[in-house]
Amino acid sequence: MKKIAQGIVRFRKLILTVAFLLLIPSAIGAVATRINYDILTYLPQDLDSMIGEVALEDDFHLASTGMITVEGLPTNELIAMKKDIEAVPGVMQTFWLSDVIDPSIPTEMLPADVQQFMFGKNDSTMLIVRFDAPSASDETMNAVSQIETLLRKDCFFGGMSVILQDTKALVNQEMPFYILIAVGASLLVLFLSLESTITPLLFMLGLLFPIAYNFGTNIFLGQISYITEALATVLQLGVTMDFSIFLLHRYQEEKELRSNNEEAMVSAICKTMTSISASSLTTIAGFLALCAMRLTLGRDIGIVMAKGVALGVICTVVVLPALILSFDRLVEKYKHRTIIPKLTKLSYFVSSHAAPIVAIFILVLVPFIVAQSKTDVYYTLFDSLPQDLVGIVGTNKLGEDFGMTTSHFILVHDDLTATQVSDLCDEINDVDGITQVVSLDSITGPGFDTSLVPDSVMEILQSGGYKLILANSSYKTGTDAINGQLDQMIRLIKAVDPEGVITGEGAMTKDLIEVADVDFKNVNVWSILAVLVIIAISFKSISIPVLLVASIEAAIAINMGIPYFTGTELPFIASIVIGTIQLGATVDYSILMTTRYHEERVFGRTPKEAAQQSLEHCSQSILTSGLTFFAATVGVAAISKMELLKSICLLISRGALISMVVILVVLPAALMLCDWIIRHTTLKWMVPESANAKKSEKE
């Protein structure tokens, strides 16, 4: 490692040149990486709802649709608007009554099902827009944007395709502000906590490289989710900042011991790499645990963030040293007083009251452990967006005028008789909450010659070996009511056609709930196991990993229990990923504290003295890192209009503070009280490592 460090110091100008040049392909890769705005596409492909979704897309071209509610518009204007919409690139068809019959025919002469489906309250009718490509495709989103410019007054555009376009527009609008607020808030904390005025700017410049490389290398994944895109910069900044802080502190220490700055940096690089190897591996392992999710959104976030941490470590020991040495004179020239002190008084208090602190903490923890499992969770994208968006208003209008709060798409084989399908429609219509059921057979009736049905209708209701039944529900997606309704409908469908499926946002969200419940357990287990193993290997201990993980898991329990007491509803993805993110991001604090405690014990101090010294000397680093992470994420939470991102960032920011307090107050007390257990369950706990250190330094 020493030879590598010497090479980094010697060729620092070349390293900086290469680092800046690599920003060019990174920018190209970042721009070329597609962003996916549809969470439901991350569901496992073997679920019935996803099988049905594929059939809707491939056979009926209905997976990607939009509904336009038109109120009080004269027929001639409506037909003119319909033609304009059909001319938009990406639109396959705009379906209305005029595609079936002469619109001059009185509506009273139409079948009751058609009247109910096509006409609603407030003198309204409905246009169905079918797109060529999937809802989350760029082609469909561009088409939606164009259609919005063609709508007349009192026209409301709703459906998943429109909501996804709204999501894209909102994320693109807010993303620059997320980055600005995260960088600005982090800089503020760093200016207040570091002596040099130049160092925070170098840190931000140093973090530019791994963040840019991370986004650029996402091109190899093909696409990432908008959630990953929105969180990656903020998380990477917050998670890897402590690596930079650690390198700086080591360099400042070594400068006092070495004859010149280059030697000091070589030593700082070696010691930093040794120190952050365990903490970075635990962070990476925590993020990779998200890959255990069946919902592949977890793999998306996990891979991007694990890659980001790995790149952050590399840039910390390769690029940042080159930056610091290049600007060392300015770093030394411009200095100011800091306001984040060493917590000396707190360190003496904690070491003198260890037992009461741990006992009180356990008592306080119990209600939060109980509460975290009772926190309400929501699963719909609809609920996480501002309610004044075009797609939200339009979708609400569908429910208001047509009773289409949720639409179910039922696919049964086309060898079922007209009578069987009509009977099934009648049974589904009797299910609580179903407002309307439409199928080809329910419209035409048994014995009707389907060759007389217009092709525009046939290709919507029968295609690819399937018959389509559309059932509208008054229940909201993601609720217990609609999930019970779906269970009842599935039983009715399977009784007639064992291979029949039900899909649509309601069915897919129900599957999402079931998958998420399993994922929550799997991710927690795998992240805890991975971190336990890495810490156990690093410290050669059985008890230390249990103690450190328990301290962070306690902080997580408090964080996730607070929403229950405040009556806050969380997005489902937050309940899955927050534990992993908080564990991976803040376990570094506990490793730093424990490493210092170990050093003090080896030096010959008593457990009480070691606890006091470790808290006093680690407090500034932990406070700086924790407050930086808090500032970056709470800033995003404060400005985001998307409830999903706001909730995740608020939980992360609060989690950083809670973990920081637990590590600064509870962990030193716990280490002191468990010292006997640690000594007897840790290999060579009290043996000085100076010989090993000298050996590695020669190597």
Predicted regions and their residues:
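Structured non-transmembrane domains adjacent to transmembrane bundles in polytopic membrane proteins
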Residues: P44-L164, D376-I544, A550-E569
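Membrane-embedded transmembrane helical bundles of large multi-pass transporters/channels
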Residues: M1-I35, T41, V91, S135-Y379, ...
